[in-house]
Amino acid sequence: MAEKEHYERTKPHVNIGTIGHVDHGKTTLTAAITTVLAEDGLAQAEDYSQIDAAPEEKERGITINTAHVEYETKNRHYAHMDAPGHADYIKNMITGAAQMDGAILVVAATDGPMPQTREHILLARQVGVKYIVVFLNKVDLVDDPELIDLVEMEVRDLLTEYDYPGDDVPVIRGSALKALQGDPEQQDVIRKLMETVDEYIPTPERDTDKPFLMPVEDVFTITGRGTVASGRIDRGTVKVGDEVEIVGLTDKVEKSTVTGLEMFHKTLDLGEAGDNVGVLLRGIDRDQVERGQVLAAPGSIQTHKKFKGQVYILNKDEGGRHTPFFSDYRPQFYFHTTDVTGKIELPEGTEMVMPGDNVEFTVELIKPVAIEKGTKFTIREGGKTVGAGQVTEILD
């Protein structure tokens, strides 16, 4: 059995992805980046067909094809997401399967911005992708430089329309295909693109630096010691002596102090984002904490019942509904670790939502849940997933 390579944390890690209209060159650019960086000893070259034949992944009950490639620049380690089909992009961005810190928007100079260009920018804005770098592709196929200037202006205007700093966004012009074919001038353009990404997209705050949050999956009692809540730490860190709040499913917030921490039946000094832990809570009875609540750093998250969500609705081939739904539809919303019934109100002008649609609507839950902008959820009906989304705005 070959030994697994150890992941060395020497450079800061950033998640990015390519977005843009079909056939504008997203996958070609992804291949070009790995090829050029491989020449510089910073990546393994991935060819177009490897990236395009993306494996299927299940994310919260939804099948998505996504290609993940990794590479390094002089300063950073990147995980780069590329998805073959338009529907895969939508699902990827909405379900948060690929949490992007920044994106490279690919626009073909031959076409200019197209419908999916707009849709991807809107989605990037909705799901909190704060930084976009533009790659104007296929510039070798446009004879008139003024046309390229025009396309750049259109892209900048479109970004401004969706609250990105259109005037300041970096725009790199080149030909991904030529770079992939080994044209030295275009390979330098790819290097310049990656230097720009390095500089323009800031290193994200690490999950461990954020306030502590752990969705409760299970609760049990240790005789003589008290109540233990277990789950996977979503963000932040926790140690013995920390004060925590138990939030959700009721308007009352219980306060407690962590008196013990264990992982894999061993005591633990510090639990951090990603760890599955059991947290022993001082002065809390078995009935004061339940699955579906969260343990959180005091004051860091509140309960809400009403919110707007950006949602992808599964089509019937994906195991979703066979029929549309209307306002007042009442499915279960699965947040953190539990289902809560909610009533959907569609936006004005939207009569109904068809399977396969991507839509923003308002939800009113029957119980308060610990949520904030960016919280992920799935929509379920009779135990099967019919949609997935995330909170875009809190309304109460």
UniProtKB/Swiss-Prot annotation:
GTP hydrolase that promotes the GTP-dependent binding of aminoacyl-tRNA to the A-site of ribosomes during protein biosynthesis. Belongs to the TRAFAC class translation factor GTPase superfamily. Classic translation factor GTPase family. EF-Tu/EF-1A subfamily. Monomer. Its EC number is 3.6.5.3. PANTHER family: ELONGATION FACTOR TU, MITOCHONDRIAL, ELONGATION FACTOR TU-RELATED. It comes from the Bacteria. This is Elongation factor Tu. Residues 175-177 are annotated as: G5. InterPro entries: EF-Tu_GTP-bd, EF-Tu_GTPase, EFTu-like_2, EFTU_2, G_TR_CS, P-loop_NTPase, Small_GTP-bd, T_Tr_GTP-bd_dom. Keywords: Cytoplasm, Elongation factor, GTP-binding, Hydrolase, Magnesium, Metal-binding, Nucleotide-binding, Protein biosynthesis. Coiled coil: none annotated. Residues 61-65 are annotated as: G2. Gene3D superfamilies: P-loop containing nucleotide triphosphate hydrolases (3.40.50.300), Translation factors (2.40.30.10). It catalyses: GTP + H2O = GDP + phosphate + H(+). It comes from Lactobacillus gasseri (strain ATCC 33323 / DSM 20243 / BCRC 14619 / CIP 102991 / JCM 1131 / KCTC 3163 / NCIMB 11718 / NCTC 13722 / AM63). GTP binds at residues 20-27, 82-86, 137-140. The keyword Hydrolase applies.
